[in-house]
Regions:
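S-adenosyl-L-methionine-dependent methyltransferase catalytic core, i.e., the SAM/SAH-binding region
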Residues: 1-214
Protein backbone atom coordinates (compact mmCIF):
# COMPACT_ATOMS: atom_id res chain seq x y z
CA UNK A 1 0.00 0.00 0.00
CA UNK A 2 1.11 3.57 -0.64
CA UNK A 3 -0.09 6.18 1.87
CA UNK A 4 0.46 9.48 0.07
CA UNK A 5 -0.38 11.65 3.08
CA UNK A 6 1.35 10.07 6.07
CA UNK A 7 0.70 12.93 8.54
CA UNK A 8 0.29 11.44 12.01
CA UNK A 9 0.33 7.93 10.56
CA UNK A 10 -3.35 7.10 11.01
CA UNK A 11 -3.92 5.24 7.75
CA UNK A 12 -0.53 3.55 7.77
CA UNK A 13 -1.01 2.29 11.32
CA UNK A 14 -4.44 0.81 10.59
CA UNK A 15 -3.19 -1.02 7.52
CA UNK A 16 -0.06 -2.34 9.23
CA UNK A 17 -2.00 -3.55 12.27
CA UNK A 18 -4.87 -5.20 10.41
CA UNK A 19 -3.08 -7.15 7.67
CA UNK A 20 0.35 -8.36 6.59
CA UNK A 21 0.84 -5.82 3.81
CA UNK A 22 3.75 -3.39 3.79
CA UNK A 23 3.37 0.39 3.70
CA UNK A 24 5.20 2.96 1.63
CA UNK A 25 4.40 6.38 3.08
CA UNK A 26 4.87 9.83 1.56
CA UNK A 27 4.65 13.28 3.09
CA UNK A 28 6.01 16.60 1.88
CA UNK A 29 6.22 17.87 5.48
CA UNK A 30 9.43 16.79 7.23
CA UNK A 31 7.97 17.71 10.63
CA UNK A 32 6.54 14.16 10.67
CA UNK A 33 10.04 12.69 11.08
CA UNK A 34 9.62 11.88 14.77
CA UNK A 35 6.51 9.80 14.00
CA UNK A 36 8.29 8.20 11.05
CA UNK A 37 11.11 7.09 13.36
CA UNK A 38 8.58 5.45 15.69
CA UNK A 39 7.11 3.52 12.75
CA UNK A 40 10.56 2.39 11.61
CA UNK A 41 11.28 1.11 15.11
CA UNK A 42 7.98 -0.73 15.47
CA UNK A 43 7.33 -2.07 11.97
CA UNK A 44 10.92 -2.50 10.70
CA UNK A 45 11.11 -3.47 7.01
CA UNK A 46 7.33 -3.36 6.61
CA UNK A 47 7.44 0.43 6.57
CA UNK A 48 9.25 2.81 4.22
CA UNK A 49 9.00 6.61 4.16
CA UNK A 50 9.79 9.21 1.50
CA UNK A 51 9.77 13.00 2.00
CA UNK A 52 8.06 13.67 -1.33
CA UNK A 53 5.03 15.35 -2.91
CA UNK A 54 2.19 13.64 -4.79
CA UNK A 55 3.82 14.49 -8.10
CA UNK A 56 6.92 12.50 -7.11
CA UNK A 57 5.06 9.23 -6.63
CA UNK A 58 6.49 7.80 -9.85
CA UNK A 59 9.97 7.95 -8.29
CA UNK A 60 9.02 5.09 -5.98
CA UNK A 61 10.19 1.86 -7.52
CA UNK A 62 8.26 -0.92 -5.81
CA UNK A 63 6.54 -4.05 -7.09
CA UNK A 64 3.17 -5.52 -6.13
CA UNK A 65 1.42 -2.26 -5.24
CA UNK A 66 -2.18 -3.07 -4.32
CA UNK A 67 -3.65 0.31 -3.42
CA UNK A 68 -2.82 4.01 -3.17
CA UNK A 69 -4.60 6.44 -0.85
CA UNK A 70 -4.68 10.25 -0.86
CA UNK A 71 -6.17 12.00 2.20
CA UNK A 72 -6.27 15.62 1.08
CA UNK A 73 -5.96 18.80 3.09
CA UNK A 74 -4.00 19.60 6.24
CA UNK A 75 -3.30 17.46 9.28
CA UNK A 76 -4.35 18.60 12.75
CA UNK A 77 -0.67 19.00 13.65
CA UNK A 78 -0.18 21.43 10.77
CA UNK A 79 -3.29 23.44 11.61
CA UNK A 80 -2.34 23.68 15.30
CA UNK A 81 1.19 24.89 14.45
CA UNK A 82 0.70 28.62 14.97
CA UNK A 83 3.99 29.44 13.23
CA UNK A 84 2.53 28.34 9.90
CA UNK A 85 -0.41 30.77 9.90
CA UNK A 86 -2.63 28.12 8.35
CA UNK A 87 -5.60 28.78 10.60
CA UNK A 88 -7.43 32.09 10.72
CA UNK A 89 -7.45 31.62 14.51
CA UNK A 90 -3.66 31.97 14.72
CA UNK A 91 -1.59 35.14 14.92
CA UNK A 92 1.71 36.09 13.35
CA UNK A 93 3.38 35.45 10.01
CA UNK A 94 1.38 34.08 7.09
CA UNK A 95 3.29 31.01 5.95
CA UNK A 96 0.95 28.11 5.07
CA UNK A 97 3.68 25.93 3.54
CA UNK A 98 3.20 22.18 3.80
CA UNK A 99 6.81 21.55 2.82
CA UNK A 100 8.94 21.44 -0.35
CA UNK A 101 7.47 24.78 -1.44
CA UNK A 102 8.72 27.46 -3.82
CA UNK A 103 7.14 30.36 -1.89
CA UNK A 104 5.10 31.18 1.22
CA UNK A 105 1.75 32.85 1.75
CA UNK A 106 3.60 35.95 2.94
CA UNK A 107 5.24 36.17 -0.49
CA UNK A 108 1.81 36.02 -2.14
CA UNK A 109 0.18 38.63 0.09
CA UNK A 110 3.11 41.06 0.02
CA UNK A 111 4.16 40.82 -3.64
CA UNK A 112 1.37 39.70 -5.96
CA UNK A 113 -0.78 42.19 -7.85
CA UNK A 114 -4.36 43.02 -6.94
CA UNK A 115 -5.58 41.21 -10.04
CA UNK A 116 -3.60 38.08 -9.19
CA UNK A 117 -4.92 38.05 -5.62
CA UNK A 118 -8.44 38.46 -6.96
CA UNK A 119 -8.00 35.42 -9.22
CA UNK A 120 -6.63 33.30 -6.37
CA UNK A 121 -9.56 34.11 -4.08
CA UNK A 122 -12.11 33.70 -6.87
CA UNK A 123 -10.86 30.49 -8.49
CA UNK A 124 -9.56 28.59 -5.47
CA UNK A 125 -12.00 29.86 -2.85
CA UNK A 126 -15.10 30.86 -4.82
CA UNK A 127 -15.00 34.03 -2.72
CA UNK A 128 -17.84 36.40 -3.59
CA UNK A 129 -15.93 39.39 -2.21
CA UNK A 130 -12.62 38.58 -3.91
CA UNK A 131 -12.30 41.99 -5.57
CA UNK A 132 -12.76 44.28 -2.52
CA UNK A 133 -10.66 41.98 -0.32
CA UNK A 134 -7.75 41.98 -2.77
CA UNK A 135 -8.03 45.77 -3.07
CA UNK A 136 -7.87 46.24 0.72
CA UNK A 137 -4.83 43.96 0.96
CA UNK A 138 -2.89 46.00 -1.61
CA UNK A 139 -3.85 49.24 0.16
CA UNK A 140 -2.83 48.04 3.63
CA UNK A 141 0.48 46.45 2.63
CA UNK A 142 1.79 49.84 1.52
CA UNK A 143 1.96 50.85 5.18
CA UNK A 144 2.55 47.63 7.13
CA UNK A 145 3.41 43.95 6.96
CA UNK A 146 0.18 41.95 6.77
CA UNK A 147 0.06 39.17 9.33
CA UNK A 148 -2.58 36.50 9.91
CA UNK A 149 -4.68 38.66 12.24
CA UNK A 150 -4.49 41.62 9.82
CA UNK A 151 -5.80 39.50 6.95
CA UNK A 152 -8.69 38.33 9.12
CA UNK A 153 -9.50 41.97 9.98
CA UNK A 154 -9.50 42.92 6.29
CA UNK A 155 -11.88 40.10 5.41
CA UNK A 156 -14.23 40.83 8.30
CA UNK A 157 -14.20 44.52 7.41
CA UNK A 158 -15.31 43.77 3.85
CA UNK A 159 -17.80 41.00 4.64
CA UNK A 160 -20.22 42.76 6.98
CA UNK A 161 -23.06 40.24 6.82
CA UNK A 162 -23.17 37.29 9.19
CA UNK A 163 -22.77 33.84 7.68
CA UNK A 164 -22.89 30.23 8.83
CA UNK A 165 -19.15 29.69 8.51
CA UNK A 166 -16.20 31.84 9.50
CA UNK A 167 -15.87 34.77 7.08
CA UNK A 168 -12.19 34.01 6.48
CA UNK A 169 -12.68 30.37 5.46
CA UNK A 170 -12.72 30.82 1.68
CA UNK A 171 -9.80 33.24 1.46
CA UNK A 172 -7.59 31.11 3.69
CA UNK A 173 -8.57 27.99 1.74
CA UNK A 174 -7.67 29.70 -1.53
CA UNK A 175 -4.28 30.82 -0.24
CA UNK A 176 -3.44 27.37 1.14
CA UNK A 177 -4.32 25.74 -2.18
CA UNK A 178 -2.27 28.25 -4.18
CA UNK A 179 0.81 28.25 -1.93
CA UNK A 180 1.02 24.45 -1.94
CA UNK A 181 -0.09 23.97 -5.55
CA UNK A 182 -2.59 21.48 -4.16
CA UNK A 183 -4.70 21.04 -7.28
CA UNK A 184 -1.68 20.65 -9.56
CA UNK A 185 -0.14 18.16 -7.13
CA UNK A 186 -3.38 16.19 -6.95
CA UNK A 187 -3.75 16.02 -10.74
CA UNK A 188 -0.17 14.87 -11.30
CA UNK A 189 -0.36 12.53 -8.33
CA UNK A 190 -3.48 10.80 -9.66
CA UNK A 191 -2.11 10.51 -13.19
CA UNK A 192 1.16 9.00 -11.99
CA UNK A 193 -0.60 6.78 -9.43
CA UNK A 194 -2.69 5.32 -12.24
CA UNK A 195 0.46 4.70 -14.27
CA UNK A 196 2.30 2.77 -11.53
CA UNK A 197 -0.72 0.81 -10.28
CA UNK A 198 -1.08 -2.70 -11.74
CA UNK A 199 -4.35 -4.02 -13.16
CA UNK A 200 -6.77 -4.72 -10.32
CA UNK A 201 -5.25 -2.11 -8.01
CA UNK A 202 -7.26 0.60 -6.26
CA UNK A 203 -6.95 4.35 -5.72
CA UNK A 204 -8.83 6.04 -2.86
CA UNK A 205 -9.12 9.82 -2.47
CA UNK A 206 -10.57 11.53 0.61
CA UNK A 207 -11.66 15.10 -0.22
CA UNK A 208 -12.83 17.98 1.96
CA UNK A 209 -14.21 20.65 -0.37
CA UNK A 210 -15.85 21.01 -3.77
CA UNK A 211 -12.71 22.18 -5.60
CA UNK A 212 -10.98 18.91 -4.72
CA UNK A 213 -14.10 17.00 -5.80
CA UNK A 214 -14.06 18.64 -9.22
Amino acid sequence: FIDCTFGAGGYSKKILENNLNNIIALDRDNSVNSIVNQFHTKYKKRFKFYNKKFSDIDQIKEDNIKAIIFDLGYSLNQISDLNRGISFNSKGKLDMRMGLNDFSCDDVISKMSQQSLYKIFKYFGDEKYAKPISKKIVQLRKNKKIKTENLVEIIEGVKKKKSGKNKSTKVFQALRIFVNKEITELIYGLIKAYDILPVGGAIAVVTFHSIEDK
